[in-house]
Design a protein with these regions (language model features):
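Class I S-adenosyl-L-methionine
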Residues: 1-124
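Class I SAM-dependent methyltransferase SAM-binding "motif I" and its flanking Rossmann-like core
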Residues: 101-160
Length: 160
């Protein structure tokens, strides 16, 4: 267990990038390696999620725990994951919750973190930003995303 023991743990949302393990940042690699527990969201207990797959390739010696977050029962599954996280925090653990892209943009992590904060106001929650898919796509295409006074807006496809 890390030095967090006895003082309350910390939940760290770790962005693992858009899918290529080589696009995990050094800070993300360190956060995963230094965690007491690494949690990876999945749609089912026996299904390897994309974030888990990336971490397995980048950090093959790290033990990963799958946490199920199902779209049809999202609220109930988020509650279950949040309860597991709170138990880890109460035990003083450093928990890394890995997610595709960036943990603060359209991420399962942000939903889980919000629920954890409801259950444990004042819980220590940190994020490690990750490279997002649009950044990788622009790099592959050799396209500049924006320059100078141009603006960028992120809009979910769910908006219709």
């Amino acid at each position: 267990m890390t030095e967090q023991a006895g003082r309350g743990g910390v939940l760290v949302g770790v962005g693992v990038g858009p899918g290529d393990p080589e696009l995990m940042t050094l800070r993300a690699l360190r956060a995963v390696r230094e965690a007491d527990r690494v949690l990876a969201p999945s749609s089912a207990v026996d299904a390897v999620g994309r974030a888990e797959s990336i971490v397995r390739q980048a950090c093959p010696d790290v033990r990963i725990e799958r946490v199920v977050v199902t779209m049809g029962r999202a609220e109930a599954s988020v509650d279950a994951v949040a309860a597991e996280v709170v138990a880890g925090l109460d035990a003083g653990q450093r928990l890394a919750f890995v997610t595709l892209g960036d943990p603060n943009v359209y991420s399962t992590f942000s939903t889980v973190a919000a629920r954890v904060r409801e259950l444990r106001p004042g819980a220590r929650v940190e994020t490690v930003p990750g490279i997002m898919a649009f950044q990788e796509l622009a790099a592959r295409a050799g396209t500049v995303v924006l320059q100078h006074a141009e603006r960028l807006a992120l809009v979910t496809a769910l908006d219709g």
